Amino acid sequence: MDLIEHTYTIQWVGPMDYEEYREYLRNQETLDSAYFNLYYFEARKDARYKWSTYIGIHKNNDGIDRRVNPSHEHLGPFIKEDAKDIKIWIGSFANEKDQKPENVDIVETLFIKAYNDRLTNNTKKKESIPSSSVCVINSYYNTNDEPILRKSEKPMVFDDVLIYLEESDSFMHGNLSKMNGTK
């Protein structure tokens, strides 16, 4: 049995088009944008085109908007061309103590390696592997902080749970088929 050295929960907010994303970050009720270190987008000019997908990071805790904006090399062209289909997700570590550059790197590397065939614009880290065993649990919320449970409303690429086992150099991933909550 492999030892899993790191376990992180990433809380994703989305999907948002670019204007909704900007509004969300300006909202006083929203978590400070400095807590969002991960972002993912799906975009296409219109229904005639294939989806482009990309996951990225912003290690500086000075606001995700410094990275996710019209000057972004992959997202920017879609924003500037007023693409009809843009879905942006921003992610934060559920435990702010985990919000460290090395952890952000491990999580990004895990996503890129596990989903390299589905991330169309990620090219640099496709051959990298996480530096240690890691488990990521993804939870999804809309812009009103309500949990998203239906797969059709979540990012098309991600699973709910993703694990890399360093010792056996293997990945496991899957979705939670049913989650119930009680009050």
Predicted regions and their residues:
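Boundary/linker segments flanking structured domains
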Residues: 1-53, 57-183
